[in-house]
């Protein structure tokens, strides 16, 4: 049933998306400077395109606070396939929702290659993210 939900949300979109996954490239000062110099001044029609930035977990609150362009979406780079509990170092989809996020990127090629995440794990994460009300940018290929 969750896969139908994913497909419905995926193929129902008529909008384009421009997403920037910052990976682990910016320091906090660089991230907020980029938001202020490049992201906040962007002019575009949010009915036609979604603009998404994806900072590291620790920078999410500062990026949310720094952005003045309310149309810009802040997404997490990953989430756990576990809910709340004793999962040291994991960030659950519920934590992401609590932080004010609506989107998460899952299945990135680097996580597949370096961390060795497989399709089964990514599907598990996707399912839990959707069940917790997150929208998913699902990377495949």
Language-model segments: what does each one mean?
Residues 2-141:
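Active-site loop-to-helix "anion-binding N-cap" substructures in soluble metabolic enzymes
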